[in-house]
């Protein structure tokens, strides 16, 4: 294998070796593997080298797989590290030894990688627990020098497993940790008195004074002073009193140890001061409230170098109002809110009152109108004969019929005087006729025309086609001259022969009609010395 070839040693219950050569080995001689020498106290073999496997690692290939099968690495790891971690029985004075293993043993799923690069072995531990590497100090009985073998820093599992060459130089000359290889690598017995290798004592943790909380150094959200300002305003009022150290939370952390800023309140009599101090890289603000009425200012300053990305709004000063002014402002805001609410309620109340008043006026006027209509309907019901209907529509229909019957009566009376032409009776008017005589007997009877047998009674032209035609009388009328018309008794229109009777000639009592007819049927006695002549009907036909 070449110098740049990579060899991986994996731990999965046992040691696994793999080698990935990139190209065949050239004719150059392979470098001699490093030799670990231990110092003994008695024998002359103190410079005897500890055997290591003669490996020729191939050139590294970053794009190939670095994990290989277990059976290819099991023999290599066991052969190479048995001489380092164990002392042969033939060398009892060997001073290279390991301390007893810790009680914590690796699980079967832990993975340990050993890489070979540029002639050196590189270890990469794939575990979740960061354990500080022990410091081995070896001392021989012949020499007084002590050599410290430092371990390279362990890298977490999420970082790159390839390390720089200068960090890998000291790893090969240091024995592997026995807690990771307790099952595959032999360990040194703890009963040997000649062993001089020991672990360096771990320094005790620094004591924390009582009443102080260690603050971790955090850089996230460090330059965002808008959150600091918001916490100052939301932290409540600032009171003057004894010195109290409060922690202001920045971000979402709620623990005091992870807070990124602390504020200290210092009492003062008057004036305004602002102090900023940087403690362990964390900005702490000291606010000095005064007793005056003007607002107090708090300045925030960053420790260390300035940051060019800080906005102007983040570095501007923040004003904090005193307690009295805060109360006055809150009272004013509360009063304004109450006044706005009351004004809104009054506006709504006035609108609702106006609407209710208009509705009341409308209801009152509607009630009055209905009362007047009911009164008029009652009056109409009293005027109609034998009307017992309560429905308004039915009452109005009866009123219409009644008015029509009255109009017909007026027309009939006018026709009797010759003032206006007759009109035809409607079919539904006859039901009101018998009940509306009004003292006129026989008004619903046909007109009193005297039938003359054998002849038709002539009628005026405007009466043609109206009503039935009556035949003429069989009995002749006496022949009267025009001069003798005064002798004929014609009832006067102004005379009232029968009391309580109407003065209309067309509407005469039937008894009077019968008497008149009987008188007309009696022929008059002929006068002596005058020839008898037939009565002329020309005058009778024309006279009425």
Swiss-Prot record:
State the oligomer form and interacting partners.
Homodimer.
**Recorded superkingdom:** Eukaryota
Q: Which PANTHER family match?
A: TRANSCRIPTION FACTOR PIF1-LIKE ISOFORM X2, TRANSCRIPTION FACTOR PIF3
| UniProt xrefs under Pfam families | HLH (PF00010)
Residue numbers spanned by region Disordered:
12-59, 185-208, 342-364, 522-544
| Cell compartment(s), UniProt | Nucleus
UniProt keyword annotation of S-adenosyl-L-methionine present: no
Question: An example of a Gene Ontology BP annotation on this entry?
Answer: red or far-red light signaling pathway
Name the UniProt record assigns to this protein: Transcription factor bHLH119
Q: Name one GO molecular function term.
A: DNA-binding transcription factor activity
Domain (bHLH) ranges: 357-406
Q: Residue ranges under compositional bias (Pro residues)?
A: 50-59
Q: Organism, per UniProt?
A: Arabidopsis thaliana (Mouse-ear cress)
**One GO cellular component term:** nucleus
* Annotated positions of the Phosphothreonine modification: 269
Q: Per the record's keyword annotation, is Glycoprotein included, yes or no? A: no
Positions bearing Phosphoserine: 274, 541, 543
Q: Which InterPro entries match?
A: bHLH_dom, HLH_DNA-bd_sf, PIF1-like_bHLH, PIF3-like
Q: What is the lineage of its organism?
A: Eukaryota, Viridiplantae, Streptophyta, Embryophyta, Tracheophyta
UniProt keyword terms in alphabetical order: DNA-binding, Nucleus, Phosphoprotein, Transcription, Transcription regulation
Q: Where is the composition biased (Polar residues)?
A: 15-29
Q: Where is the composition biased (Low complexity)?
A: 522-535
